[in-house]
């Protein structure tokens, strides 16, 4: 992992430096922008080549809602490193919880899923975030997330 992180766009190589996830469980392709301590925006290009479309659902492919939540959580964990840059290379950011998850519209192959995660507060060792996913400027998923370091 890198020892230093700077705000801005992050490609998949930079994301893999921060997250422990690997294929086939990386649910974010790029970080588009970061305002440390406030908001991060990431994206996932949803393609028919995703393994989960083999069974979810044959003839009517839909991205599983739990994987949309996972994508939001991964983007949130990247943001967590910007709230605690001393943790980079020394700790793992973990998804600690989810509340008020809602799935508004199906996400299908060919969609570009934009994740927007905002820092709400930090309390003790927990980072609280508000997260939404968009396709074509329409909310498709939203939730309140929690993350922590170990």
From Swiss-Prot:
It holds the Pfam family FabA. This is 3-hydroxyacyl-[acyl-carrier-protein] dehydratase FabZ. Belongs to the thioester dehydratase family. FabZ subfamily. The active site is at residue 56. It comes from Desulfotalea psychrophila (strain LSv54 / DSM 12343). Involved in unsaturated fatty acids biosynthesis. Catalyzes the dehydration of short chain beta-hydroxyacyl-ACPs and long chain saturated and unsaturated beta-hydroxyacyl-ACPs. Coiled coil: none annotated. Keywords: Cytoplasm, Lipid A biosynthesis, Lipid biosynthesis, Lipid metabolism, Lyase. Its EC number is 4.2.1.59. HAMAP family: FabZ. It is found in: Cytoplasm. GO terms for biological process: fatty acid biosynthetic process; lipid A biosynthetic process. One of its GO terms (molecular function) is (3R)-hydroxyacyl-[acyl-carrier-protein] dehydratase activity. Its main location: cytoplasm. It catalyses: a (3R)-hydroxyacyl-[ACP] = a (2E)-enoyl-[ACP] + H2O. The lineage of its organism: Bacteria, Pseudomonadati, Thermodesulfobacteriota, Desulfobulbia, Desulfobulbales. GO terms for cellular component: cytoplasm; membrane. It comes from the Bacteria.
């Amino acid at each position: 992992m890198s020892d230093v992180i700077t705000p801005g766009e992050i490609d998949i190589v930079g994301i893999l430096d921060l997250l422990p996830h690997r294929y086939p469980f990386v649910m974010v392709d790029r970080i588009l922008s970061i305002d440390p301590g406030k908001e991060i925006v990431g994206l996932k290009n949803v393609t028919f080549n995703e393994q989960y479309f083999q069974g979810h659902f044959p003839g009517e492919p839909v991205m599983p809602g739990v994987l949309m939540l996972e994508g939001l959580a991964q983007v949130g964990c990247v943001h967590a490193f910007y709230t605690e840059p001393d943790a980079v290379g020394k700790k793992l950011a973990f998804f600690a919880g989810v509340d008020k998850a809602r799935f508004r519209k199906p996400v299908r192959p060919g969609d570009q899923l934009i994740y927007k995660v905002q820092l709400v507060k930090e309390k003790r060792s927990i980072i609280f975030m508000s997260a939404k996913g968009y396709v074509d400027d329409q909310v498709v998923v939203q939730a309140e997330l929690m993350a922590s370091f170990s």
